[in-house]
């Protein structure tokens, strides 16, 4: 599947991929939402690792499609495979955590990952994705600038089935 790009990802200092679905280890329970509910199998983690990706963004509109348990299990599976993750958490504070990657002589990279408010957003008490909030991300970026040499902001936007812009954009 990734044979054509593997040589590129393996040469990169940091290679990032978005994981657009939760992994389902058990009978998933799709959430009520507009649009499709996606799910993946554990072999997807092996494919990402084989391809040479070492960071996975998880803040997107499908990460909660099979519920909070699958969301958190997806992060655990990726991290157990040696792939760093960013953009989700057991609550909104954890989901907003900035990922720092120290590249020794090349410096430290900070990654901020968030997404539009659809069906996947973490709350104060529930797991999910880091919501797009320009004020929160501004402060996260300012703090990251004091701790890292480079700051990368990745915003996932995918408002489905509408011709209108989301109010957050």
Segments the model singles out, each with a brief description of its role:
Residues 1-165:
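Acidic, metal/ion-coordinating pockets
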């Amino acid at each position: 599947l990734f044979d054509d790009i593997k040589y590129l990802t393996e040469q990169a200092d940091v290679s990032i991929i978005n994981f657009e679905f939760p992994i389902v280890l058990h009978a998933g329970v799709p959430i009520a939402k507009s649009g499709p509910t996606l799910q993946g199998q554990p072999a997807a983690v092996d494919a990402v690792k084989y391809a040479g990706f070492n960071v996975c963004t998880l803040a997107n509109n499908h990460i909660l499609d099979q519920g909070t348990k699958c969301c958190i299990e997806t992060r655990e599976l990726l991290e157990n495979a040696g792939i760093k993750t960013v953009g989700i958490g057991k609550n909104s504070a954890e989901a907003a955590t900035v990922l720092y990657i120290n590249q020794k002589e090349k410096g430290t990279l900070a990654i901020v990952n968030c997404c539009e408010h659809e069906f996947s957003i973490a709350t104060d008490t529930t797991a999910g994705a880091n919501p797009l909030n320009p004020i929160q991300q501004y402060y996260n970026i300012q703090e990251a600038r004091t701790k890292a040499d480079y700051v990368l902001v990745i915003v996932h936007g995918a408002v489905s089935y509408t011709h209108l812009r989301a109010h957050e954009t």
